[in-house]
Swiss-Prot record:
Name of the protein this chain belongs to: Large ribosomal subunit protein P1
Gene symbol of the encoding locus: rpl12
Protein role: Forms part of the ribosomal stalk, playing a central role in the interaction of the ribosome with GTP-bound translation factors.
Biased composition (Basic and acidic residues): 76-87
Region feature (Disordered): 67-107
NCBIfam families: ribo_P1_arch
Keyword Ribosomal protein: yes
Keywords: Ribonucleoprotein, Ribosomal protein
CDD domains per record: Ribosomal_L12p (cd05832)
Gene Ontology molecular function terms on file: structural constituent of ribosome
GO biological process, one term: translational elongation
Any Pfam family: Ribosomal_60s
Entry GO CC: ribonucleoprotein complex; ribosome
Biased composition regions of type Acidic residues, renumbered to the chain: 88-98
Amino acid sequence: MEYVYAALLLHSVGKEINEDNLKAVLQAAGVEPDEARIKALVAALEGVNIDEVIEKAAMPVAVAAAPAAAPAEAPAEEKKEEEKKEEEKEEEVSEEEALAGLSALFG
């Protein structure tokens, strides 16, 4: 993450994001720079509009609030469970009545 932060720092102050600048920022922060990681980051950021990426990354935060509607469905589920329980009770009663009818046959 330090490498990405260094690149963002360079971008925010208007400096070019290159290997030498990244290495200098990392050393100033007390991080031992890894040349391979620096080269990979510079290559990955080549041709990328960082301002546009930051703007797009900030947008989904507002969309994340949408799933809050799920708890409103809980009462509907409770009603379904209550209906199932009532149906089970009715089935139990009808079984008891059926058994009572059989006992009447045998006296």
